Amino acid sequence: MDKLIAVLVLITLGSIMVNVGVHYVPVGGAPAAMATATGVGTGTTQLAAGSGLTGLITAAAMSQKPFLVILWNGALGAATMMAITMLVGNFIYVYGVGCPPCSAKVDKDPITGWDQEAYVTPGTEGHGIPTVSFVSGILGGLLGGSGGAMVYYALYKVLGMSAALAGILAMGFFYANAVLASYNIGGTIEGYHDPKFTRLPKAVVCSLVFGIVASVIAYYLSTLM
């Protein structure tokens, strides 16, 4: 029973952290790929899953270390992947397309205080990844990576699953939460300053329910092994 409670807490909390982290990630979808919207030019699930997979790999590399080391390593792996992706994206937007990173959803960047309106191309929602979106993306990577690492720890250390099976299940849980967040966002999001970020409570409830169900399934799956 103690093991079930531990798994329930870790997987549910990890799922919520992943879901919340996805809402911080600046995703612009197809419009961003054409430099007509702020964010990285890909889908929410793809970008979140990419950073999550990186976080799981870095967490698994420290699987014999204490809990906090695994957690922090997963967070750093996902955040580093997000930072590199956004930085390379900005290089392409600035030096390839020739447009400055800016947002049409705020008059001034909440972090730097720089004016945005003068740099937004008419008819677009901004372009590139401005400072506030960049910082938001790193925060999302830290949350998502640590959440994924928490799920991996529950499966590998607490339930005693093999590293391969724990990694596969943790990735599946990550994808499920990324899809839940994607449906909740409904398209593109620039980060924590985006009006869509206020939809977060609904996503947390959905992730809570999913985490409980996933915990029970994972626990009883481990008893069959």
UniProtKB/Swiss-Prot annotation:
Q: Which InterPro entries match?
A: MeTrfase_D (IPR005779)
Which spans are transmembrane here? 5-25, 40-60, 67-87, 132-152, 161-181, 204-224
Q: What membrane topology does the annotation report for this chain?
A: Multi-pass membrane protein
| Location in or out of the cell | Cell membrane
Group of enzyme by EC: translocase
Could you say which EC number(s) this protein's record lists? 7.2.1.4
User: For this protein, what reaction is catalysed?
Assistant: 5-methyl-5,6,7,8-tetrahydromethanopterin + coenzyme M + 2 Na(+)(in) = 5,6,7,8-tetrahydromethanopterin + methyl-coenzyme M + 2 Na(+)(out)
Any single GO BP term: methanogenesis, from carbon dioxide
* Primary subcellular site in the record, as a coarse category: membrane
The pathway entry for this protein reads as: One-carbon metabolism; methanogenesis from CO(2); methyl-coenzyme M from 5,10-methylene-5,6,7,8-tetrahydromethanopterin: step 2/2
Q: Which UniProt keywords apply?
A: Cell membrane, Membrane, Methanogenesis, Methyltransferase, One-carbon metabolism, Transferase, Translocase, Transmembrane, Transmembrane helix
Q: Which Pfam families match?
A: MtrD (PF04207)
Q: Which GO terms describe its molecular function?
A: tetrahydromethanopterin S-methyltransferase activity
Q: Which GO terms describe its cellular component?
A: cytoplasm; plasma membrane; vesicle membrane
Record flagged with keyword Methyltransferase: yes
Family membership noted in the UniProt record: Belongs to the MtrD family.
This protein's assembly is summarised as:
The complex is composed of 8 subunits; MtrA, MtrB, MtrC, MtrD, MtrE, MtrF, MtrG and MtrH.
Role: Part of a complex that catalyzes the formation of methyl-coenzyme M and tetrahydromethanopterin from coenzyme M and methyl-tetrahydromethanopterin. This is an energy-conserving, sodium-ion translocating step.
Query: By what name is this protein known?
Result: Tetrahydromethanopterin S-methyltransferase subunit D
Gene that specifies this protein: mtrD
